[in-house]
From Swiss-Prot:
Classification via HAMAP family: SlyX
Family membership: Belongs to the SlyX family.
Protein's name in the database: Protein SlyX homolog
Organism taxonomic ancestry: Bacteria, Pseudomonadati, Pseudomonadota, Gammaproteobacteria, Alteromonadales
Pfam name, any one: SlyX
Amino acid sequence: MDNLENRVEELEMKIAFQDGTIEELNTQVIKLNNLLASQQDQLRILLSKLHAVEPSNMASQSEETPPPHY
């Protein structure tokens, strides 16, 4: 009977440890999810600002004349 009690106690300790680990992982997932949402918002803002910028007076790469050594 003592062996069975030891096995049950060991299983209970493992479950308690796993519960703590799951809670820590859940906390990290929540933090990362919030960080991702914030970064997505920032990217959305940057993209809207980028699209709003007027094109520059510089010629595009395809319109540039090649340098003299070509």
